[in-house]
């Protein structure tokens, strides 16, 4: 059975979806440093991270079973993309996953400013 490791509080639906597709899934709430990450990746083929976990060349070298890294955030700058690509590790992210939420916030801010709510807020 393929193993997946999801870090940094990735939504439980992601873990369940992976289980539904035959993965053995381990989840952890926080980010891991390089040494801890290498230890945790023993036998893992899929790593799911957010922006605080760095996937360096050293991590990639130490984890031959790793085949994919999912960045559950906007960017992929926390992963050594060139090195991952040279080692056949696919890296993906969800760049527009929060677009609707951002639009809703901006519209709400516009309405608040039009109604002068910040000017009428007392601390």
Segments (PLM) and residue ranges:
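Phosphate/diphosphate ligand-binding glycine-rich loop within oxidoreductases
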Residues: 26, 33, 45-123
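N-terminal glycine-/charge-rich "phosphate-binding" loop or analogous flexible N-terminal tail
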Residues: 1-46
């Amino acid at each position: 059975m393929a193993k997946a490791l999801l870090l940094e509080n990735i939504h439980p639906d992601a873990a369940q979806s992976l289980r539904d597709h035959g993965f053995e899934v381990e989840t952890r709430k926080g980010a891991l440093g390089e040494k801890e990450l290498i230890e945790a990746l023993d036998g893992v083929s899929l790593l799911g991270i957010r922006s605080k976990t760095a996937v360096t060349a050293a991590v990639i070298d130490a984890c031959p079973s790793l085949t994919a890294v999912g960045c559950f955030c906007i960017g992929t700058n926390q992963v050594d993309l060139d090195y991952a690509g040279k080692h056949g590790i696919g890296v993906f992210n969800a760049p527009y996953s929060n677009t609707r939420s951002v639009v809703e916030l901006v519209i709400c801010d516009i309405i608040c400013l039009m109604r002068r709510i910040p000017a009428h807020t007392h601390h």
